Amino acid sequence: TFCQATYYMMGEDLYKVIPRLADKIMFVHFRNAAGTKVDFRETFHDNGELDMPRLLRLYRDCGVDVPIRVDHVPTMAGETVRNAGYDALGRLYALGYLRGIMETVDKEA
């Protein structure tokens, strides 16, 4: 599993790591975050430090054609915090965002 935000929070340059590891990536955690490895916060997928459309283009350009899962979604208004990071409304928001980017990236190819 390649958790892009984890690599980023460790200080890695994703735009160098993904091409280097492309043939070893079997599953992507599509996740965004902000901060540092010792003081970070989960963000909405469209509101962190990572350029999510650019990352999807990079996966495509490197031949990474694997399952992608939205991961660590923020809890949205009206949700309980029973399953923090994996609640339904935040996940639906993230899936819609991912789907929109994927459609755009596919049209560019």
What does each model-found stretch correspond to?
Residues 1-109:
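Histidine-acidic metal/acid-base catalytic patches
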